[in-house]
Regions:
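Juxtamembrane "helix-exit" motif on the non-cytosolic side of transmembrane helices
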Residues: 17-28, 68-81, 127-132
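Short active-site neighborhood of thiol/selenol oxidoreductases, capturing the structured segment around
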Residues: 160-184, 189
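Alpha-helical transmembrane segments
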Residues: 3-20, 59-68
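Thiol/disulfide oxidoreductase modules built on the thioredoxin-like
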Residues: 224-229, 236-284
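N-terminal "domain-start" segment that seeds a small globular fold
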Residues: 128-162
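Structural microenvironment flanking redox-active thiols in thiol-disulfide oxidoreductases
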Residues: 184-225, 236-243
Length: 286
């Protein structure tokens, strides 16, 4: 196919719209596919026999579609942060495609290796870190924030203090009745709890945050039907979630001595608990 501006524009458009549905599977997969396909496509465009300036101009044509479709979404909708990296992958792929093409043959292995490493990292661990940042405000979960004295009722109406004084470790799993993913993560939260049953100073609670469609007693009824060993607490308003800076569900919070020390996914809280218990053992052995 002759590499005219029109053909490049149409071909890159077809490639763009073929990739777009992959976003429903995962933006990490989009990142990988875009990096592979767009870098190769850019290299192919540059392999034409036209002058260098014309080649450079043609290599930027594939960016018309992501600029026209994705960039405005990120400008208008703050919730689109989750897909920023997959959008950036178009520019990364074209940039490295140009760099690889312009590098002399013997040195080409350097940008190829760098691009491969970046692609693999962000298509795997890097995207997980970014999602953690978007959902919880931190890349790895570690925070250190003071929290005021907070009490919430349990299923029996008894008030439970959540500030973790006297070296107690309080682990909270925030959920709502409409959050299907919260229910999927409950078994994982319970498995974490089981690991620390021998330590009476580590407490695990699932904290329900009410939503507008909840009827009185809905959350309590659901909690009583769940087959897990952790206790349930019930917030009367969303204000509690704001006090803990919870912006998405589920969110797991670890509190000790009036300070939030972890905010993130349930999968990362065990390392924070282990770190705290190890520090306590060291103090005891001094």
């Amino acid at each position: 196919m002759k590499r005219t501006n029109k053909n490049i524009f149409l071909s890159s458009g077809a490639l763009f719209f073929l990739i777009m549905p992959i976003g429903s599977i995962g933006h990490d997969i989009v990142f990988f596919v875009v990096c592979c396909s767009y870098s190769l496509f850019t290299f192919y465009v540059l392999s034409d026999t036209t002058s260098f300036k014309v080649k450079m101009a043609k290599s930027l044509i594939p960016l018309i579609y992501p600029v026209a479709f994705h960039v405005p979404i990120h400008i208008i909708f703050s919730d689109a942060q989750v897909s920023i990296l997959s959008t950036a992958s178009y520019f990364l792929a074209v940039g490295f495609g140009i760099l690889i093409y312009c590098t002399k043959n013997r040195l080409r292995i350097v940008p190829i290796a760098a691009f491969t490493a970046i692609t693999i990292f962000f298509a795997t661990k890097g995207y997980d870190l970014w999602l953690h940042k978007v959902n919880y405000g931190t890349y790895l979960g570690g925070v250190e924030e003071a929290i005021t004295n907070i009490e919430l009722p349990n299923a029996n109406g008894e008030k439970i203090v959540l500030t973790g004084y006297n070296d107690e470790i309080i682990v909270l799993d925030f959920w709502t009745t409409s959050c299907g993913y919260c229910f999927q993560k409950f078994p994982v939260f319970d498995q974490v709890r089981k690991k620390y049953t021998s330590n009476s100073r580590i407490k695990f609670y699932a904290v329900n945050i009410p939503i507008s469609r909840d009827k009185s007693g809905d959350a309590l009824q659901i909690a009583r039907e769940l087959p897990y060993g952790f206790s349930h607490l019930f917030s009367p308003t969303e204000a509690i979630a704001r006090q803990f800076n919870v912006n998405s569900y589920p969110t797991v919070i670890l509190v000790k001595n009036g300070r939030i020390l972890y905010r993130g996914d349930v999968g990362g809280v065990s390392s924070s608990i282990n770190k705290l218990t190890e520090e306590e053992l060291k103090k005891m052995n001094l």
